[in-house]
Amino acid sequence: MSDNINKNGEFDIPETAQPAQYSWNNTPQPEGSNEESPVMIRRRVKSGYNWAGSIILWQQLFAMIGMVIFQMIYSAMVMPSIIADNPELTAETITAELTARMSEGSAMILMNSVCMLAANILAIIIVYFASKKFKFNEMFSKPDFPSSGIVLAALGIFGIQGFSILVQTLVTTLTGYTGMSETTSSALSFTDNIVTNIVLLLYVVVAAPILEEIMFRGLAMNLLAPVNRTFALIASSLLFGLMHANFNQIFNGFLLGMLLGYIALKSGSIISSMICHVVANANAMLLSYIFEHKLADTIGDKAYTYEFIAFAAELVIGGVALFFMLKKYGKVNQSDIITTSYTYEFEQAEEKKLTWSALLKSPTFWVSAVICLGSACLMLTQVTVS
């Protein structure tokens, strides 16, 4: 025992007894966190991954419940008129007529907008309060990023959208499939009804970007970020892409999520990523309105050629903007973070176990992936053949 007493009369703890698997960084930590053991920390990290994966589950669950309720209400409203117009209809033909009316643009847009709005809000509430990982207001801090960087990111979005459209066009040319069912397309397309178009714009351009940034950059990415920022960026972008649940948007969603996550981490706030997300959706809706809704009625298929040219131009502009943005601000590193209350540092070997290895063992991640990819595969049987 005397060999372990140093010259100051203090007991020397052997180096092998030190908990070398983790250490705290210099950011503020949750109350009582210094008393956590390595085992508790690992459990805390893995719990965060499970809550990140559950965001899609809650969203899909509430969306499904909402759509069932909406369909029941809509059926009760239009069924009397269907029967009155043709009292000799059979049960099968009534169901077919009801389905046809429900699939029309206005009804589908209203159902999709209202149900997804409610589903996103409820998913955010549950995951935020149940996970208890960080403070909500930290996500909305003032962006620590120059406005020129946000402008470059917004322009970079044009490049991502242009690239995605070119890839989708190539796939459609080779396979004949557009990648999106008529029902999904009608839920995201303009109609001749002004009120419906306003609802569509408010949801797609305003509500969806705000709520999705809270869900995937504010919650999911932060829940995935305590060990490695780059891992959190890629994993949250993967979840964001899967959330769209159709192959036409999964790829685009992943790339868009990477850029939005990058700008959120670099600026330390989801306000900047919200701005860029609004720009992305507004750009897509504007081009859709001009080329697919207005010009298509006057110049026919030439409108789609012009739309293709517009996206090709955006690819060039956005590509240049992304190049300068990445050159100026560099890659994501451990100093990039949105919230400061939930961060750990691990040795490299332990870090590998607590990133992809841990996420791939998360049941909520796999259930979410199966649901979203299953929906995308199911849509392949319903897509419009070009």
Task: Give the role of each language-model region.
Residues 224, 232-286, 294:
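Contiguous mid-protein beta-loop-alpha structural module that forms a pocket-lining wall or clamp
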Residues 83-84, 88, 97, 105-108, ...:
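Juxtamembrane helix-loop-helix connectors linking adjacent transmembrane helices
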Residues 56-75, 151-167, 265, 271-279, ...:
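Hydrophobic alpha-helical membrane-insertion segments
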Residues 159-162, 185-250, 255:
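Function-critical hydrophobic alpha-helical transmembrane segments in multi-pass membrane proteins
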Residues 1-142, 284-386:
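N-terminal, membrane-interfacial amphipathic/helix-forming hydrophobic leader that caps
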Residues 116-123, 200-204, 253-257, 318:
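Hydrophobic core segments of transmembrane alpha-helices in multi-pass, intramembrane catalytic enzymes
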Residues 64-65, 158-162, 237-245, 279-288, ...:
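Aromatic-anchored segments of alpha-helical transmembrane domains
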Residues 53-57, 113-114, 150-155, 198, ...:
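Hydrophobic alpha-helical transmembrane segments
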